[in-house]
Each structure stands twice: as C-alpha cells, then as structure tokens.
Amino acid sequence: MTSLPRAQVAENPDSLLADPIAWFLAEHHRHRQFCDLMQRASIATGFEPDLIAWLLKFVVEDLSLHVLDEEQDLFPLLRARAEPEDSIDALLGRLTGEHEKDLLRAAAVRRHLETCLRLQVPISGNNVRRRSLQAFATQERSHLALENAAVLPIARLRLSERDLANLSRRLAARRDITRRPAGRSTDAKAVTR
C-alpha cells in the first residue's frame, strides 16, 4: 500500500452530527472503507506496521463506540417510536445479536493484529489471521448494508426533531464534542452511498 490509512478512510466532520441519521450513514461508509483496508491488508505480503496499528486502533476505539451508539441510543429510540408495521423488534434483535458476535470477532481480530505488530509479520503470513480478518470484514459489510437498507430509513421516518436533537447530543457527548442544535438535513445525498 502506498498511502496511509487515514487518507483512505474518511473522517466525519463534527458538524455532521447536526443530522444524526446522515451521520450514521457517513459512519457506515467509514466502516466499509475500514473493511476494504482490512481486506487489502490481509493479503499484503509485506509487514506494514502503520497500517496494522491503525486497523487495531479502529477495531478497539471506533467499532466499540459505534456499537454503543446503536445499542444505547439509536435502537432504544427506534423501539420507542416504531409503528407495528415497521416490524422493528425482530430486526433490531437480529442486529443486537450480530453486535454481540461482532464484539467477539473483534476481540479475535484485535489479538491477530497485536500478534502481527509484536512479531513484525504481515497478516497474510498466517492463514488463521488472514481468514479471520477477511471473515470479519465480510460480516461487517453485510451488517452495515442491512442497517442502511432497513434501520436508517425507519429512523428517518419515525424519529421526531426532539429525538434527533437528543440523539445528536448523546453521540456528541460520547465523543466529547460540543454540539450545536440538531435537526434533519435537507441534503444528505453525499453520505448515502
């Protein structure tokens, strides 16, 4: 790889938290970029300590934070606001189960990345490590696609301005960001890829 990971994974501007649904879409895009990097790193033949360290940091910090965002804030709001025809309980139950499995898989990925750094070896040098990272990336992409296709449209439809403002504040507080008033974005096209 010729460029640093930060150049390949977009950072979300703090101001995007003014529209938390658009922020989740952008955050999901970042996670897909992370998965792409992890896939590429899993087959790289050379030892790339900066990349491996960055992947490790993302797994430890960003992934855990994202699960908290959804489990403690977004999902409870959706359960409270969804209509019966939304059939949200089964969907959120499935995603919560996936989050639990994701955290277990992330712990294994973390150990693999730490081992690579400690031994100064590429991920691809060990089939167990390589397959673990590839499987994690594949599962994460599928999970994100389901959230984008089903959860976020329901959130956009059902959450009130007050819900969105509270969600925005909670997401910002978890990141120690001072927030301005939240609301619905009229132009979230840039983050809906």
Region annotations inferred by a language model:
Residues 1-193:
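Small-residue-biased structural context
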